[in-house]
Amino acid sequence: VGPTGCGKTTFINLLMRFYDVDEGKILVDGKDIREVSRHALRSSFGMVLQDTWVKSGTVRDNICFGKPDATDEEIICAAKEARSWEFIRRLPKGLDTVLHEDSISQGQKQLLCITRVMLCLPPMLILDEATSSIDTRTELQVQEAFDKLMKGRTSFIVAHRLSTIRNASLILVMKDGKIIEQGNHEELLKKGGFYHKLYHSQFES
């Protein structure tokens, strides 16, 4: 968590090895990520970003992007888990509906992206939480899908609203490119530092 421009995206880029650290190291299961190939590292992550995309093709093509041999049964099961089946089955041709960039809403794109990740079930997740640009009902569906997806997985959440990370086991508070505080929600509130100010300013506004 942290204000705009604090380094949250840079942190994720380092985690995914889009570029490497200049000093220090990032360890996953005790191993320096620079000792692992970029392909192997990235394939162990599932990503759901708020500015997600759909490729030109069918709904099925978009969901099976990371698992091209998936059966319809597996796809439908993942879609139900990800709360996207409700809108998919209403599309003119269901899974065979051809999508373009503006065929579905931003929230529906995010639900599709969650379905894609749900189908592959990677060991780690990077989630950029839903924004206020989606309607409340879809936002609740996205949050439910996130909760389902995170069970039993190491998850990194880029949070814009602090209410969504109250149950996180560890919160990293960033400012000006540095981690300035860390702890769980209760610990950080008790410290009365930057997180405390950030949290209360969101609820006051």
Name every feature range the model reports, one short phrase each.
Residues 1-205:
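ABC-type nucleotide-binding domain
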